């Protein structure tokens, strides 16, 4: 068995075309979604990621802006800028690129975003809504993972899904989405005993810990579906996933590559949530 490659680039391309069509429809009502991104400091990876989001938004017809603040910017100034965006009726969605400099509290900043413009889905209100099955804005990587599984027609009902990692950004929210799809979900983490035994029982594995080579063919059962969220740069700057891709693809039924798997869907879901935010505030959701 050689695994079906779950091509995130192609899935994202098709999804973004549908978003572009919806943006065009919205423009007929006189509304254009706008994504505002706050970037504090000069972290190279963050700058690159923010530019990718801006470019992707503009490519589907949205307006996008980057508010680039100096590394030494105080927390008060960041919060003031957020308040301005919260009250700007032209802004549909707001996200703050992390990590933030040490003088700025990430939690304070995330809590200061208007939950109705929180397109990253990290505000406590939006996290809470996810956990009572009444979500509006869901964190983008978990949402992207579910789109990959849906696109591949993978039926999750009754399946054993194992999530490696318990972060609030990926592990915990994707576990909740898998539960909503009626999978039986196990979360593995750094204190889990006998991780291999859990992995061997898994029909679906989602790994999101940033440990290259963690998942090997020895701990994957034949026919499992593998979603690799890891993206750790090696000494040459090449991105490595958590999964030993070349060997695991020989026994899995489907697998995401790194890069080109989950990553393109994460940015796509930022756009999805920005469009949703604009529709909701204009009363245009069906």
Swiss-Prot record:
Q: Which GO terms describe its cellular component?
A: cytosol
What GO terms in the biological process aspect are recorded for it? L-histidine biosynthetic process; methionine biosynthetic process; purine nucleotide biosynthetic process; tetrahydrofolate interconversion
Reaction it catalyzes:
(6R)-5,10-methylene-5,6,7,8-tetrahydrofolate + NADP(+) = (6R)-5,10-methenyltetrahydrofolate + NADPH; (6R)-5,10-methenyltetrahydrofolate + H2O = (6R)-10-formyltetrahydrofolate + H(+)
InterPro entries given for it?
Aminoacid_DH-like_N_sf, NAD(P)-bd_dom_sf, THF_DH/CycHdrlase, THF_DH/CycHdrlase_cat_dom, THF_DH/CycHdrlase_NAD-bd_dom
Q: Which residues bind NADP(+)?
A: 165-167, 190
Q: SUPFAM superfamilies from the xrefs? A: Aminoacid dehydrogenase-like, N-terminal domain (SSF53223), NAD(P)-binding Rossmann-fold domains (SSF51735)
What highest taxon heads this organism's lineage?
Bacteria
| Enzyme Commission number, as recorded | 1.5.1.5, 3.5.4.9
Q: Which UniProt keywords apply?
A: Amino-acid biosynthesis, Histidine biosynthesis, Hydrolase, Methionine biosynthesis, Multifunctional enzyme, NADP, One-carbon metabolism, Oxidoreductase, Purine biosynthesis
Query: Could you tell me which pathway this protein works in?
Result: One-carbon metabolism; tetrahydrofolate interconversion
Q: Name one GO molecular function term.
A: methylenetetrahydrofolate dehydrogenase (NADP+) activity
Looking up Pfam families in the UniProt record yields: THF_DHG_CYH (PF00763), THF_DHG_CYH_C (PF02882)
List the NCBIfam families.
PRK14175.1, PRK14186.1
Q: What does this protein do?
A: Catalyzes the oxidation of 5,10-methylenetetrahydrofolate to 5,10-methenyltetrahydrofolate and then the hydrolysis of 5,10-methenyltetrahydrofolate to 10-formyltetrahydrofolate.
Q: Which PANTHER family match?
A: C-1-TETRAHYDROFOLATE SYNTHASE, CYTOPLASMIC, C-1-TETRAHYDROFOLATE SYNTHASE, CYTOPLASMIC-RELATED
- Quaternary structure note: Homodimer.
Q: Which family does it belong to?
A: Belongs to the tetrahydrofolate dehydrogenase/cyclohydrolase family.
Q: What is this protein called?
A: Bifunctional protein FolD
Q: Could you tell me the gene encoding this protein?
A: folD
